[in-house]
Regions:
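Broad gene-expression machinery/nucleic-acid interaction feature
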Residues: 28-30, 44-46, 58, 85, ...
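Short, internal acidic amphipathic alpha-helical interface segments
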Residues: 54-98, 141
Length: 141
């Protein structure tokens, strides 16, 4: 996989959400963006995408602060049991707790496979089935 050509395609693809390069090496490319989807989420979401030249893709969606309570942990477990794509967890960042969703895929050796996966996951984030289990965690009911 040629990360340089992929980078240009990703930046063009990601213009609507302000996707920017965070870091690049010969083996990996990291991009990030702040996503605003007020129709679905009251606050912006931080998106980080990491692509390895081996064909592995990771997407991290970091939401706003949440409390690390038993109720939220049970809701996160429900989400994880129902979500075929994302895995949710509480990420401890700078002494604060945030809800984070993670998606990963391996064996994506063509640029188009990466672009299709990213597009699909961005759309999956706002699908009714995802929101059904995500909104209670975020108190967006």
């Amino acid at each position: 996989m040629n990360l340089l050509s992929l980078k240009e395609k990703l930046l063009d693809f990601g213009k609507p959400i302000g996707l920017q390069v965070d870091e690049e090496t010969s083996k990996a490319l990291t991009l990030h963006a702040g996503i605003v989807a007020k129709k679905y989420f009251p606050k912006s979401i931080y998106l980080r995408i990491v692509i390895f030249s081996s064909g592995t893709l990771h997407m991290f969606f970091t939401f706003y602060e949440i409390e690390s309570t038993y109720d939220n942990l049970f809701l996160i477990n429900d989400f994880n049991a129902e979500s075929p794509w994302f895995k949710a967890y509480i990420a401890h960042i700078n002494d604060k707790d945030f809800l984070e969703l993670h998606y990963s895929a391996m064996g994506l050796l063509e640029d188009q496979e990466i672009l299709t996966s990213i597009s699909y996951m961005l759309n999956s984030l706002i699908e009714e089935e995802t929101l059904k289990y995500l909104n209670p965690i975020l108190n967006n009911e």
